[in-house]
């Protein structure tokens, strides 16, 4: 607005100076009059604006143009103002009202500011009061906490220190039951409190309470000792189930032992010794009676005469009557005795039930049953001792007696045991029992089982050496029989060896393999000596083949895949089979074989002194053609007679006929090279005929 008024002022001044001059018109216009110009200029000298223009030296036209532009701008602004001015005037009442409201608000806010300032001062005062109250509250809380701690300690002290009348009544007059055990626990805590708490030792009340606690301790110890002794007496009664009594009575009151350990060490040692003595005697008697009972069930398998190389055929009637009952088939053969390994974890035999059935058992069955009973008893006792007494060493003191009883029994049995198979079965049983105890994680029988194992192996080695010695020292003249069928000693050997191979399949015992090899060498030597007693080589070979074949068949049952020993006898069988087949052919076709081996080979030599002629081979061809079938039939009958194993005999016959075909083929080849040999073609047996005969026997086979 100020700029607008200034512009109007300048315009009026210029109007007064220039009149109604239009700036857009050209000053050079001829219509403009210059009269009086000097006078007007003089009059305007005193004007400040004009003086400034003239003094600055600006051109009048340029200045006028600038003024014109300013005027136009002012004109435009005035137009905008003129447009907005009516709206402004229209809303002026509202603006006035708004101005009044703002003024009223300022008054209200000023009042509120004053009020809040007052509140702030009051809150500051209250905050100080609260802080004081908070400090007082914390102080009171700390004092309350200290009082409660003091009260708690004092209450606990009083509770741990005093002896309630009810506790005295239970300890002195009560029966030993669950309530009594709980009261013992309370008494134990009080005794420990008096012994260990320094505050109690300096307390004057100790003089009043300590004598009473000591009386209660002595009474409790006396009472629980009598209780335990009565239960130990119950263990000694015949037919008492020890394990049930331990589980239902002793373990139920096992805190008594803990109490005695802490507050009656001497009495605890007496109880411990009494339990050890009781259980030692009870278990020793138990195992002693069990051993005596199953000795009646024992089946004696072998004696000192039951060795592979010992001739037992000549035993007289009177000497037989003195021998114990034995299963002759089980002396050298494993048979059904292997079942004991498969039934290793079966329950122990009950003697009176087994005796009622009138059954007898090989010793390894009784051995397993005895050790099954020992394992179960030892496992139960070991766990009980650890749970009841809290120590493992007590077990070994208890079982010193039972171990001694069993050791004594085993020593007496092993010293007279000649059953090698039974001994190895017992060794395997011990091995499985060690595995069972390992799975149970019960180590209490480790040293015992090791000791038994150490006792078994030397005896087994001794008996095994006796068998080897019996073969080496056998009197061949006594045991020899004029029979080419398998010898009874070789059958014993085969069954004996097969038994040990079977028992060693899953164990791979190298020491046993060495002993079996020693046994094989001894029987090899013996069987060759027996074979040489036959007058004819053919009989010797038949005897050896029959024995080797039987041995292989027995060994295959024990180890179908074939082991080192079986392979050895297979090689011997193969070599003797070839020799026998050759011997059989020589017996029936000696001339032809002799010719083929000597003269047929000469035919290929360039330096011949004497050529083979038709006359030389013609008798051979005609002889073979006339009787070859008959000869094969005789060979067949001979083989059936000689060999107990039909399959083995057929193998030998087929091998012999195959060899015969080879000899005859070589003879034919020789004839083809002889001058005039074609004349013998009508007498030659063709190849197909011989093959047909071989196939015929193969079909029979």
From Swiss-Prot:
Alphabetical keyword list: Coiled coil, Endosome, Golgi apparatus, Membrane, Protein transport, Transport
Subcellular compartments: Golgi apparatus, trans-Golgi network membrane; Endosome membrane; Golgi apparatus membrane
Tissue: Detected in pollen.
Coiled-coil intervals, chain numbering: 23-45, 511-533
Taxonomy, superkingdom: Eukaryota
Pfam families reported in the protein's UniProt record: Vps52_C, Vps52_CC
InterPro entries hit by this protein: Vps52, Vps52_C, Vps52_CC
One GO cellular component term noted in the UniProt record for this chain: endosome membrane
Keyword match Ligase: no
GO biological process: one example: protein transport
Topology term for the membrane: Peripheral membrane protein
Subunit structure: Component of the Golgi-associated retrograde protein (GARP) complex.
The family this protein is said to belong to: Belongs to the VPS52 family.
Role according to the record: May be involved in retrograde transport of early and late endosomes to the late Golgi.
Identification of the protein by name: Vacuolar protein sorting-associated protein 52 B
Gene designation per UniProt: P2
